[in-house]
Regions:
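Mid/C-terminal beta-alpha module of Rossmann-like enzyme folds, strongest
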Residues: 1-76
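A short glycine-rich, His/Asp/Glu-containing loop-to-beta-strand
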Residues: 72-111
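Short acidic-glycine-tyrosine-enriched beta hairpin
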Residues: 134-158, 164, 172
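Short beta-strand His + acidic residue motifs that chelate non-heme Fe in jelly-roll/DSBH
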Residues: 86, 110-112, 130-132, 152-155, ...
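A short beta-loop-beta micro-motif enriched in histidine and acidic residues
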Residues: 95, 107-120, 147-149
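Structural signal for conserved beta-strand scaffold positions within catalytic alpha/beta enzyme cores
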Residues: 19-21, 75, 88, 100, ...
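Glycine- and acidic-residue-biased ligand/ion/polar-headgroup-sensing regions
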Residues: 116-135
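Double-stranded beta-helix
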Residues: 137-139, 166-193
């Protein structure tokens, strides 16, 4: 914009200014409407748009900049029980989903394994232990984790795993999984570590 204004100020004849706008994105109006509706729906279904597409990325940024200031925030569905809570945060078709897990003191969650899901756990508050056991082995592997020392623990397929809160307060874990949860095909199999 400042380049355009500069040309207006420096031109002796303002009617002869011609500038080419780049980049040019070719897209149908109906596709733009679909994108705008998807942006609106993303606050409920948590699906982020494909940021690899330059036009989608720019349109999403523009969409957010036009939200009323009282609409910058939106609630998430917390699945709460006596053990703590599990809340889905972000989903993408290309890169899986991110969730927030809160575990009460002394609670162990998990004791399951996956065929195709791999996960990354990051404890950001509290202290705990993540345990693994290959499904065809008796050897148990332990990683002690803490919000005081941020480190990612990969959860590979074929390992039953759990996470236990060893602290006196809630433990908060950011969890990434490589695919969006599908209730019809959960790929989650109970097996104690």
């Amino acid at each position: 914009m400042s380049s355009f204004i500069g040309k207006l100020k420096n031109s002796s004849n303002n009617t002869e200014i011609f500038e080419k706008v780049t980049p040019v994105h070719e897209i149908k109006l109906g596709e733009i409407v679909d994108l705008l509706n998807a942006f609106k729906d993303s606050r409920e279904n948590l699906l982020l748009p494909n940021m690899n597409d330059a036009f989608t990325k720019k349109l999403y940024s523009t969409y957010l900049s036009y939200l009323p200031t009282d609409k910058f925030s939106y609630p998430l569905k917390m699945n709460v029980d006596e053990r703590g809570s599990f809340t889905e945060f972000i989903k993408t078709q290309e890169r899986g989903q991110v969730s927030i897990n809160i575990s009460k003191p002394g609670i162990t969650k998990g004791n399951h394994w996956h065929h195709t899901k791999n996960e990354k756990f990051l404890v950001v508050k509290g202290n705990g232990v993540i345990r693994f056991r290959k499904t065809d082995s008796t050897e148990i592997i332990e990683y002690f984790v803490s919000g005081e020392k941020l480190e990612v623990v990969d959860i590979p397929v074929g390992y039953t795993h759990n996470i236990e809160n060893l602290g006196d307060s809630d433990m908060v874990t950011v969890m990434w999984v490589n695919e969006i949860f599908d209730a019809e095909r959960p790929d989650t199999y109970y097996l104690r570590v």
